[in-house]
């Protein structure tokens, strides 16, 4: 077991010395109970982001390596559930049985290894499906000013996947918890939560959790 000490901590970032063999993306366990993820490797110290407040972390406190890469539990049990950026349930429906553990950052497959995009993903919006069709497997940016209907397009697309064998993952970053709760109720009312996972990193969550939220959603999708 390799043990280090905190040099500085603040603004959800900590600098630690004594962890010579720490790896990029590894989870560190602080004596206060807070966990962090290594993001900066230097000859004499490492820098990490904290998945919790830095107020309880003092200079000189103990830090332990876990040997685990930052990841998220995955499994079919996540369908219909609302989780945070670490895969922990936040919908009050109890624990989620996991069937594996995937790193939140994994190498992207090469072009040869990727499956071709050969089937459409219908959004249910005639203007998009007829003029700008989206293929299953492609990435699509929806950009626009506030209150212009970006979320409505994404929500309509999720609702239109019912009965098509598509699993939808909605990652909410920096939104109000009340807005996400309203969205989940809408999905439940339309029967869409049966094939949907919601990852929520609200405005009240730490910047570190908001940062890893899209990676967590991608890991769930890769499963």
What are these regions (language model features)?
Residues 61-63, 70, 74-77, 90-139, ...:
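P-loop NTPase nucleotide-binding/switch module
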Residues 148-195, 216:
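Conserved P-loop
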Residues 133, 160, 223:
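Hydrophobic/aromatic ligand-binding patch that stacks against planar heteroaromatic rings
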Residues 50, 94, 144-146, 172-173:
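Glycine-rich, histidine-containing beta strand-loop boundary motifs that form or position
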Residues 7, 141, 167-169:
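Conserved beta-strand elements of the Class I
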Residues 216-223:
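Conserved alpha-helical scaffold flanking the Walker A/P-loop in AAA+ ATPase domains
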Residues 21, 53-56, 69-70, 87-89, ...:
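Conserved nucleotide-binding/hydrolysis micro-motifs of P-loop NTPases
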Residues 1, 5-121:
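Acidic-enriched and Gly/Ser
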């Amino acid at each position: 077991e390799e043990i280090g000490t905190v040099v500085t901590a603040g603004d959800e970032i900590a600098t630690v010395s004594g962890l010579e063999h720490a790896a990029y993306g590894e989870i560190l366990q602080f004596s206060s109970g807070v966990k962090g993820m290594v993001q900066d490797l230097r000859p004499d110290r490492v820098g990490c982001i904290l998945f919790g407040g830095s107020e309880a972390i003092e200079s000189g406190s103990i830090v332990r390596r876990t040997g685990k890469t930052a990841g998220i539990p995955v499994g079919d049990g996540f369908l219909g559930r609302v989780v945070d950026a670490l895969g922990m349930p936040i919908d009050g429906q109890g624990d989620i049985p996991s069937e594996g553990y995937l790193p939140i950052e994994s190498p992207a497959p090469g072009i040869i290894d990727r499956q071709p995009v050969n089937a459409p993903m219908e959004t249910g919006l005639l203007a998009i499906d007829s003029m700008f069709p989206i293929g299953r497997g492609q990435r699509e940016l929806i950009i626009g000013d506030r209150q212009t209907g970006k979320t409505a397009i994404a929500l309509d697309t999720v609702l239109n996947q019912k009965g098509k064998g598509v699993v939808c993952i909605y990652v909410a970053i920096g939104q109000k918890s009340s807005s996400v709760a309203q969205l989940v109720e809408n999905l439940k009312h339309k029967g869409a939560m049966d094939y949907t996972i919601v990852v929520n990193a609200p405005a009240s969550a730490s910047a570190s959790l908001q940062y890893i939220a899209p990676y967590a959603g991608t890991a769930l999708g890769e499963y």
